[in-house]
């Protein structure tokens, strides 16, 4: 389950436009786990 979730997250990350990606990197520095959890919930 985890590997598939991470794989889907990576796909979403590549699809995202540049500005969103930039803000996401900024948020990742603050709290990578909560950011990932939010993305997972959105995917579900």
UniProtKB/Swiss-Prot annotation:
**MF GO annotations:** structural constituent of ribosome
- One GO cellular component term, please give it: cytoplasm
Name the domain of life: Eukaryota
Write down the Pfam families for this protein, in alphabetical order.
Answer: Ribosomal_S7e (PF01251)
Name the keywords, alphabetized.
Cytoplasm, Cytoskeleton, Nucleus, Ribonucleoprotein, Ribosomal protein
Q: Where in the cell is it found?
A: Cytoplasm, Cytoskeleton, Microtubule organizing center, Centrosome; Cytoplasm; Nucleus
The biased composition feature labelled Basic residues covers: 18-34
Biological processes, Gene Ontology terms: translation
Answer whether the UniProt record assigns the keyword Transferase to this protein.
no
**Region (Disordered) location:** 18-44
UniProt lists the family membership as follows: Belongs to the eukaryotic ribosomal protein eS7 family.
Its biological function? Answer: Component of the small ribosomal subunit. The ribosome is a large ribonucleoprotein complex responsible for the synthesis of proteins in the cell. Required for rRNA maturation.
- Assembly description: Component of the small ribosomal subunit.
Protein name as it appears in the record: Small ribosomal subunit protein eS7
Tell me the organism: Salmo salar
Query: What is the phylogenetic placement of the source species in the record?
Result: Eukaryota, Metazoa, Chordata, Craniata, Vertebrata
> What gene name is given for the protein in this entry?
rps7
């Amino acid at each position: 389950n985890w590997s598939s979730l991470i794989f889907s997250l990576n796909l979403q990350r590549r699809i995202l436009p540049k500005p969103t990606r930039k803000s996401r990197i900024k948020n990742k520095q603050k709290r990578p786990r909560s950011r990932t959890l939010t993305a997972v919930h959105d995917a579900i």
